[in-house]
């Protein structure tokens, strides 16, 4: 009997292996296509109109043109052989090509993602409901904001919209990559639907919320393709500094012949161009765009859609994170943990009335009460409750329950609300109600009072569980210098207990949507950058106010439009990872800038002695690397300058590994690795290249 099971398991494993192999082959093919496209684009980007957007590499391209032209003209210096100019020009050409390749490779990954998204945009038809009630079939491209559309099982949702009638399971795997369908229903925070997703059960009526070209997928395609990419403030500032350095060195090199003529010797133009290229920060200049694009790409791969690079950078500078308790810090499913009778009541009486109040309650809390009572074998009359009239929970009453046919009113709800309700009917309150409610709150639970007419029977202890690992994650944020603030509608005692268990720095209890804005503004007034998550329409003002607002894809259209990031997986805890990606982007840019400027030191020791040794023999003392000859020294410095760019492309694309630590510790670590390393590596690299070049000169 065991043999068929073994064979079946083996076949399943083989099919899984084949599936993995197919995925690997497809990934390799896609990578080859991206590289091939990037190589073509690196040549196309040689267009001066494109190159001028990167002033540093534009100067290198001008140097290539000058030395290329000089290679066909008679040499003005007897010490410079004819092949030198063409060699320098070719090295400069490859320097520019390598920089273009880095940028094109980063853009190519975005294009591949965009192509994948475009596949989800199929030519579908929509069943539009006219004002007179007639249903007309039109193309999805003809839909306009405000149109009402009926989508049935098996049909594609034609455009972004909000459910106004019905409930259905929707397959959003084309957008989120998550195979499990999600429930979409009219009203509430889960009414938003995305064009290109599939209704897999039931039927819904939606109102279209976007015009053609403005849908969520259209925005995603535009962003990942880079069409809407703008340089971030930090990127512009760094680019300005690097351009200023380039301009200063350009002035130095242009005026240098005046001084050398005064000293009685001349420097060949190709040597001056080589000096300029070695002086300016070409390494970071060639990788700067790729770093920014790759940072956006990493966020997208994490299934987060950033509306701009500025949002990703801001995430890296965040000082405070505002987090909802429910669903972010805790699982959000408050379950019945125990029953506490009050006065002279028994647990059986509490369980009986708690169950009757919950029979028609479809909330997770209501279901958990029924499960708990049944698990304790407490008897109750289910038919009695089913024949009654259900009273749903409302924010105004903070209670739910059932009105039985005989006029009996059964309620469960917030302590204060139920006590007030009982007192309004002339009832008396047992002395131990508040005492036991406080005990539940101190333990991090939520107390619900169970009452029948003017009599309180006891309390239901609802407990929400903190997600595992949250304390460690908050400790990591604390090491980064980031403060965490938990916002919750719970009472202060419950909030304090959860905050202590989770390890957050501060909490705001009995928090309303407008309170979140106040918290954000208070932090911003202190000069801090604030991040928060949200999914409801009531979160939209706070998401718009925050420096980084992460909206859930399952949330409302208002929330997604107010935020500058959207999490396609609808996982609020992902804000912590987004902050890490932002810091990684900033750290990668800073580390490679440090490395680029530091490795110029070695190039100075290579090229400056080579320029002046013939005229000023004493300059030979600066040739500490003992390079073969002046010409090999210049060529070696230029070759290293070019080769280091493609060698650093993987690091620029992947990003430097980020470990939570203080800013001072991080600065010291990076200065040691990329500052000192940026000095040592070129000395070794140039010396090795010189030994090889010396064999041919």
Swiss-Prot record:
Enzyme class: translocase
Origin: domain of life: Bacteria
Topology with respect to the bilayer: Multi-pass membrane protein
TM stretches of this protein: 55-75, 79-99, 245-265, 271-291, 605-625, 633-653, 677-697
EC numbers: 7.2.2.6
Signal peptide: none
Binding-site list for Mg(2+): 535, 539
Keywords, in A-Z order: ATP-binding, Cell membrane, Ion transport, Magnesium, Membrane, Metal-binding, Nucleotide-binding, Phosphoprotein, Potassium, Potassium transport, Translocase, Transmembrane, Transmembrane helix, Transport
Location of the protein in the cell: Cell membrane
Active site: 324 (4-aspartylphosphate intermediate)
Binding site for ATP: 361, 365, 393-400, 412
One cellular component term from this protein's GO annotations in UniProt: plasma membrane
Pfam families (alphabetical): E1-E2_ATPase (PF00122), Hydrolase (PF00702)
InterPro entries named among the record's database cross-references: ATPase_P-typ_cyto_dom_N, ATPase_P-typ_P_site, ATPase_P-typ_TM_dom_sf, ATPase_P-typ_transduc_dom_A_sf, HAD-like_sf, HAD_sf, P-type_ATPase_bsu_IA, P_typ_ATPase
Catalytic activity: K(+)(out) + ATP + H2O = K(+)(in) + ADP + phosphate + H(+)
GO molecular function: ATP binding; ATP hydrolysis activity; magnesium ion binding; P-type potassium transmembrane transporter activity
Keyword match Membrane: yes
Membership in a protein family: Belongs to the cation transport ATPase (P-type) (TC 3.A.3) family. Type IA subfamily.
Subunit structure, interactors included: The system is composed of three essential subunits: KdpA, KdpB and KdpC.
Function text: Part of the high-affinity ATP-driven potassium transport (or Kdp) system, which catalyzes the hydrolysis of ATP coupled with the electrogenic transport of potassium into the cytoplasm. This subunit is responsible for energy coupling to the transport system and for the release of the potassium ions to the cytoplasm.
Name of the featured protein: Potassium-transporting ATPase ATP-binding subunit
Gene name per UniProt: kdpB
């Amino acid at each position: 009997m065991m043999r068929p099971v073994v064979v079946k398991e083996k076949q399943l494993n083989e099919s899984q292996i084949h599936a993995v192999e197919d995925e690997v082959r497809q990934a390799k093919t896609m990578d080859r296509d991206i590289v091939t496209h990037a190589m073509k684009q690196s040549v196309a980007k040689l267009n001066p109109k494109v190159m001028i957007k990167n002033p540093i590499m534009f100067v290198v391209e001008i140097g290539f043109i000058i030395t290329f032209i000089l290679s066909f003209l008679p040499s003005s210096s007897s010490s410079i052989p004819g092949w030198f100019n063409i060699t320098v020009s070719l090295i400069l050409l490859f320097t520019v090509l390598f920089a273009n390749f880095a940028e094109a490779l980063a853009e190519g990954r975005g294009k591949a993602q965009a192509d994948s998204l475009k596949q989800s945009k199929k030519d579908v038809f929509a069943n539009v409901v006219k004002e007179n009630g007639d249903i007309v079939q039109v193309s999805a491209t003809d839909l306009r904001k405000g149109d009402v559309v009926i989508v049935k099982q098996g049909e594609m949702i034609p455009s972004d919209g909000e459910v106004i009638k019905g409930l259905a399971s929707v397959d959003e795997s084309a957008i989120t990559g998550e195979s499990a369908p999600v429930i979409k229903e009219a009203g509430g925070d889960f009414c938003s639907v995305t064009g290109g997703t599939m209704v897999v059960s039931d039927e819904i009526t939606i109102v279209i919320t976007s015009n053609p070209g403005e849908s969520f997928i259209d925005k995603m395609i535009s962003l990942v393709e880079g069409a809407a990419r703008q340089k971030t403030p930090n990127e512009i500032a760094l680019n300005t500094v690097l351009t200023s350095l380039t301009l200063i060195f350009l002035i130095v090199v242009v005026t240098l012949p005046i001084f050398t003529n005064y000293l009685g010797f001349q420097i060949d133009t190709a040597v001056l161009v080589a000096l300029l290229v070695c002086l300016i920060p070409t390494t970071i200049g060639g990788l700067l765009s790729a770093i920014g694009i790759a940072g956006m790409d990493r966020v997208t791969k994490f299934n987060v859609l950033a509306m701009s690079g500025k949002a990703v950078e801001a995430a890296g500078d965040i000082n405070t994170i505002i987090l909802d308790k429910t669903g972010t810090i805790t699982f959000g499913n408050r379950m019945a943990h125990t029953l506490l009778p009050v006065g002279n009541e028994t647990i059986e009486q509490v369980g009986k009335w708690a169950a009757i109040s919950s029979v028609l309650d479809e909330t997770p809390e209501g279901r958990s009460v029924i499960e708990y009572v049944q698990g304790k074998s407490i008897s109750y009359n289910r038919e009695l409750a089913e024949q009654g009239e259900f009273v749903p929970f409302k924010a105004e009453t903070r209670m739910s329950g059932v009105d039985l046919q005989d006029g009996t009113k059964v309620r469960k709800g917030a302590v204060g609300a139920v006590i007030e309700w009982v007192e309004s009917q002339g009832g008396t309150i047992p002395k131990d109600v508040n005492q036991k409610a406080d005990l539940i709150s101190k333990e991090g639970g939520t107390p619900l009072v169970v009452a029948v007419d003017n009599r309180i029977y006891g309390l239901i202890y609802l407990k929400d569980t903190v997600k595992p690992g949250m304390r460690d994650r908050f400790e990591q944020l604390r090491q980064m210098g980031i403060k965490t603030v938990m916002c919750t509608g719970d009472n202060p005692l419950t909030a304090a207990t959860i905050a202590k268990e989770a390890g957050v720095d501060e909490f705001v209890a009995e928090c309303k949507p407008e309170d979140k804005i106040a918290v954000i503004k208070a932090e911003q007034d202190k000069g801090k950058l604030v991040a928060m998550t949200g999914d409801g329409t009531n979160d939209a003002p706070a998401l718009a106010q925050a420096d980084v607002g992460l909206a859930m894809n399952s949330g409302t259209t208002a929330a997604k439009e107010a935020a500058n990031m959207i999490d396609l997986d609808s996982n609020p805890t992902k804000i912590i990872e987004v902050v890490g990606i932002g810091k990684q982007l900033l750290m990668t840019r800073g580390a490679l800038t440090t490395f680029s400027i530091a490795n110029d030191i070695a190039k100075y020791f290579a090229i400056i002695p080579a320029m002046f040794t013939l005229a000023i023999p004493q300059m030979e003392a600066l040739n500490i690397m003992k390079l073969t000859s002046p010409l090999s020294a210049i060529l070696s410095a230029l070759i290293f300058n070019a080769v280091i760019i493609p060698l650093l492309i993987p690091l620029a694309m992947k990003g430097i590994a980020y470990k939570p630590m203080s800013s001072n510790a991080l600065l010291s670590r990076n200065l040691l690795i990329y500052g000192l390393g940026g000095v040592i590596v070129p000395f070794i690299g140039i010396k090795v290249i010189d030994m090889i070049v010396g064999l041919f000169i």
